[in-house]
Amino acid sequence: MTKSETTLSKLLVESELVQECEELLSSLPRDRSVFAEYLYQYQGFWYPPNLLEGVLYSQKHFQARDSDIVLASIPKSGTTWLKSLVFALIHRQEFQTPLVSHPLLDNNPHTLVTFIEGFHLHTQDTSPRIFSTHIPVGSLPESVKDSSCKVVYCCRNPKDAFVSLWHFMKNLIVKEMVGCTMEEMVRFFCRGSSIYGPFWDHVLQYWKESRENPKKVMFVMYEEMREQPQEWVMRIAEFLGYSFTEEEIENGVLEDIIKLCSLENLSKLEVNEKGKLLNGMETKAFFRKGEIGGWRDTLTPLLAEEIDKTTKEKLIGSDFRFFC
């Protein structure tokens, strides 16, 4: 197929998908939100129309391979950092120390590891292919569920994830956010009406899947990774079948990867300070503090209590607990 034929095919697929999504929206529950004019509930989770199109696209067209790696999370839970770490550990033989020409120095992690719900034809030829997703586990494409591909899910404390989402949406200057108070956004967040929400359902379903199918899904906590990066990068590498050798560890390969992928280092790179993604989004929007417990600088005690109350209610009957 020629390049022009491929482009035409892609446009036809997208056109059909937009029409299908418009027809579907009329039958779905909807809720006003600060994240978009309306969010629509599909398979138990809430999406603005453009993100729902991406979910439908992936469900219809994404074909997973047994060697694929899928990095999953709900937004603002360490996605960017996880992408950089996994990309670096998988490709460490190609880009060895000194890391003076590593792709992460000139490319944002979201450029190197794309979303399966993105509008592209998933034509990566390299193996393993690395993708990311915010799609809930129950809505993943059937090919992901049926194949032997590996899924790594990153979870973050809901208060820190909320604050990160708040700043992210403000930076994007989403029109629905104009004049929105944090109190309003907390209310939407706690009732589940946020992008890919309810937050707690998203986390718990992946956690349950990781316990029922531990060879398929690995569940990691952002906070534990921040506190013990070497241990968790080694665990992830082992889960994916790319364990570090003793020689690599002695030669500082693991340490170099962690330094390269640190949020402090990535945020200072020109590509992440001044760059833009293909959709026009500024790359600097993906980097803030990334601190554990940073919510204390933003949330009032009452708002923190409201999120904690929802968390307690959502975890009834489960032995899962968030970090801090």
Swiss-Prot record:
Main localization category: cytoplasm
Gene Ontology MF terms in the entry: flavonoid sulfotransferase activity; sulfotransferase activity
Coiled-coil positions: none
Active-site residues (renumbered): 134 (proton acceptor)
Subcellular location: Cytoplasm
Disruption phenotype: No effect on sensitivity to salicylic acid.
GO CC annotation terms, alphabetical: cytoplasm
Residues annotated as binding 3'-phosphoadenylyl sulfate: 76-81, 156, 164, 222, 288-290
InterPro entries, A to Z: P-loop_NTPase, Sulfotransferase_dom
Record's keyword terms, sorted: Cytoplasm, Transferase
Record-listed E.C. numbers: 2.8.2.-
Highest taxon above the source species: Eukaryota
Summary of the function given for this chain in its UniProt record: Sulfotransferase that utilizes 3'-phospho-5'-adenylyl sulfate (PAPS) as sulfonate donor.
Protein name (database record): Cytosolic sulfotransferase 13
Species this protein is from: Arabidopsis thaliana (Mouse-ear cress)
